[in-house]
Amino acid sequence: MNHFPKLLSSQIGFDVAQTMLENFDRHYRIFREAAVEAKTLYEHGDWHGLQRLARERITSYDDRVKECVEVLEDEYDAENIDDEVWQQIKLHYIGLLTSHRQPECAETFFNSVCCKILHRSYFSNDFIFVRPAISTEYLENDEPAAKPTYRAYYPGTDGLATTLERIVTNFQLEPAFDDLPRDIGCVMQAIHDEFGHFDEAPNFQIHVLSSLFFRNKSAYIVGRIINADRVLPFAVPIRHVRPGVLSLDTVLLRRDQLMIIFGFSHSYFLVDMGVPSAYVDFLCTIMPGKPKAEIYTSVGLQKQGKNLFYRDLLHHLSHSSDRFIIAPGIKGLVMLVFTLPSFPYVFKIIKDHFPPPKETTRAQIMEKYQLVKRHDRLGRMADTLEYSSVALPIARLDHALVRELEKEVPSLLEYEDGNLVIEHLYIERRMTPLNLYLQNGSDSDVEHGVKEYGNAVKELMKANIFPGDMLYKNFGVTRHGRVVFYDYDEIEYLTDCNVRRVPPPRNEEDELSGEPWYTVGPHDIFPETYGPFLLGDPRVRDVFMKHHADFFDPALWQASKDKLIQGELPDFYPYDTALRFCTRYPARFGATDQNDGAGDAQRAA
């Protein structure tokens, strides 16, 4: 820009900036209130209430943005504010953020509002926050009544057992613990099993984030152990062993275990953060290498995560030279998928037209993606980032990809200043398609992949999700070896499905027919018919029948549906259930109801 205002002379500019910040502050207050309510719901064991709260919080941000846009249009005729005033609005906003506790999130809110009002030609750092303006380094809430981001404990003074007990009791959870000294003993034993004996350095200390992380039926204590130059992460899930009684379920001591519980295939945590950047910085120390965008998303600030991701993409494009290409693998009927090999994500666009047998619409597919966003994903469904008006340099697009885009999605394309602007797309983490993983893998890979696939579908089933198209190509294998579902255009609630057995053939002609001899309704599912599509490879068939022979029995599916209709919410664990204390150290527990279901070593990661 050639001219930037030297004098902030516009009263409207200040008023608009203040109005936008007031609306952001309202949004963040509601965000924090949800986390406080989550603690109460958790203490009372109100799991349906927690699910409702998590769903409502996901839509809250867009509601607040819409409200803010309406206020600006009604009171300030925002669409007709001239360019110089918009520049002053941004500068006033920056000034208002100098002592703010969530400046990075407030900047993102500003962008969201502006993108609803301004043409995309204004999406530059002159008018919106393409780059952050306010530093979040060393940001802390220093108000007397505020909780610190984390608390430091020194086991060398009072001993490790006493310190661990103080850490747990400081969260002041209302229900009593079944046997907290026993659980503390299990934590200490697990630490010894993992690290053996270690000498305590002068700086031996434990840092614990001041708020609990709530998700599903667990509340997580998250922290780090510091000893000499070592930083050891940990997370302790607290669960109800029976109504009104709590227990420490396990302790997770490996970075890869924490990476999974904070992973992109899980629903967002509810956690009360006065200074979110300080929480994210802390989490970065225990999960180095995990992008800040993913961490912000995992703690419920998905719009901030989305903003950071887009900045990461622009930065990567500035420091790379490879081209976007059509994604390897079997082409989908509904989605056009492409990727940048040097960037670990895929870009998915809904096609303009769908060939038979697909009978759906763009609006219906977008609603399916929203269903997944709102639903508890249990570590088995990939999160997606949804973007509008994405401009990609034409010079970075492979010619074959451009031809495919012009063929399949011409209605969503616009050429502008050397860029191809795509009206709407989704972005997901890139995974190895399960069909390729099974096709190219060793025998042990095949066993792992098939076992994970069956577990994934069964866990989705218990969570009221019917994948629809269950072919292996619609599932991916993450870098941690977990199988995750990522094709959502045929997804349905299991409770909306009619589970049926295949009727016996009426005669020999029926038996030899390649077509069903029975009527099939739009919501009918026939688990007995899945075998031919899933068991064609002899290696896969043998392993599948070894681990998941019940998969093709309609009774399995109907039982899950019946429990859901009765309001039952099953237990899920984002870690191997063999790590649960009641399984790992059974002698410490004796005969207790904590062991119910522990033998099913599911991985709901």
Curated annotation (Swiss-Prot):
ATP binds at residues 327-333, 348. It is found in: Cytoplasm. GO terms for biological process: glucose metabolic process; glyoxylate cycle; tricarboxylic acid cycle. Belongs to the AceK family. The active site is at residue 383. It comes from the Bacteria. GO terms for cellular component: cytoplasm. HAMAP family: AceK. Bifunctional enzyme which can phosphorylate or dephosphorylate isocitrate dehydrogenase (IDH) on a specific serine residue. This is a regulatory mechanism which enables bacteria to bypass the Krebs cycle via the glyoxylate shunt in response to the source of carbon. When bacteria are grown on glucose, IDH is fully active and unphosphorylated, but when grown on acetate or ethanol, the activity of IDH declines drastically concomitant with its phosphorylation. It comes from Burkholderia lata (strain ATCC 17760 / DSM 23089 / LMG 22485 / NCIMB 9086 / R18194 / 383). This is Isocitrate dehydrogenase kinase/phosphatase. It holds the Pfam family AceK_kinase. Its main location: cytoplasm. Its EC number is 2.7.11.5, 3.1.3.-. It catalyses: L-seryl-[isocitrate dehydrogenase] + ATP = O-phospho-L-seryl-[isocitrate dehydrogenase] + ADP + H(+). GO terms for molecular function: [isocitrate dehydrogenase (NADP+)] kinase activity; AMP binding; ATP binding; phosphoprotein phosphatase activity; protein serine/threonine kinase activity. Keywords: ATP-binding, Cytoplasm, Glyoxylate bypass, Hydrolase, Kinase, Nucleotide-binding, Protein phosphatase, Serine/threonine-protein kinase, Transferase, Tricarboxylic acid cycle.
